[in-house]
UniProtKB/Swiss-Prot annotation:
InterPro entries: Glutathione_peroxidase, GPX_AS, GPX_CS, Thioredoxin-like_sf, Thioredoxin_domain. SUPFAM superfamilies: Thioredoxin-like. Pfam families: GSHPx (PF00255). This is Phospholipid hydroperoxide glutathione peroxidase, chloroplastic. The active site is at C111. It comes from Pisum sativum. It comes from the Eukaryota. One of its GO terms (molecular function) is phospholipid-hydroperoxide glutathione peroxidase activity. It is found in: Plastid, Chloroplast stroma. Keywords: Chloroplast, Oxidoreductase, Peroxidase, Plastid, Transit peptide.
């Protein structure tokens, strides 16, 4: 059975993440080459540039691994095939979101991107939740150890400081040998342009009403930049 191995080309200029100096920071001097992709819905593809992932980029040390994913298995699966635990450790079948557009994000409380992303995610959810949008937040502590708190602390932070009303789930790994199955699916379904690795906090996956991943956005893409893509899927 045919399989496809994903490359590690990453299509967007990842610039300064404004992290605390005590944590490692992404490389800011990455070479750019003209992309062969003519167009895309995503703002970073529209820039027309691509770049190779730098070995200096702060990914999970020693745990990351490349793997091939069976093409038919990807085609046959949807997000609805997975059950995850919510922030209170209760099982949640993602089939409950059938027929909705999903924006899935790995979040962190102490990242330079935290404030802008939580604020904009909350606005998007407020504006489109009654039209069929769900934002699903998965806390992750793999990038700079920027989500160290307990589930209760994470929930308190998001719901109190940013008035987050969208679902927040149990803390997960998004890379490495302990990657949550739902993230194995998300990464496998989003093609070879990004490779297997989630690059940093607040990488985003857009899932259509049929449970299929239709777009993947780098951490530096703000939620507001995704609004038009969300509206198109909601109208479909």
């Amino acid at each position: 059975m045919a399989s496809m191995a994903f490359s590690t080309t990453f299509f967007t200029p990842l610039r300064d993440f404004n992290q605390p100096r005590t944590n490692s920071t992404p490389s800011t001097s990455l070479p750019f080459t003209k992309s062969s992709i003519a167009s895309s819905k995503s703002p970073f593809f529209q820039l027309g540039f691509s770049q190779q992932a730098s070995s200096n980029f702060p990914i999970v040390p020693s745990k990351t691994r490349s793997f091939s994913v069976n093409a038919k298995a990807i085609k046959d699966k949807t997000i609805y095939d997975f059950t995850v635990k919510d922030i209170d450790k209760k099982d949640v079948s993602l089939s409950k979101f059938k027929g909705k557009v999903l924006l899935i994000v790995n979040v962190a409380s102490r990242c330079g991107l935290t404030s802008s992303n939580y604020t904009e995610l909350s606005h998007l959810y407020e504006n489109f939740k009654n039209k069929g949008l769900e934002v699903l937040a998965f806390p992750c502590n793999q990038f700079g150890m920027q989500e160290p708190g307990s589930n209760e602390e994470i929930k308190q932070f998001a719901c109190t400081k940013f008035k987050a009303e969208f679902p927040i789930f149990d803390k997960v790994d998004v890379n490495g040998p302990f990657t949550a199955p739902v993230y194995q699916f998300l990464k496998s379904s989003s093609g070879g342009f990004f490779g297997d690795i989630v690059k940093w906090n607040f990488e985003k996956f857009l899932v259509d009403k049929n449970g299929k991943v239709v777009e993947r956005y780098p951490p530096t893409t703000s939620p507001f930049q995704i609004e038009k893509d969300i509206q198109k899927l909601l109208a479909a």
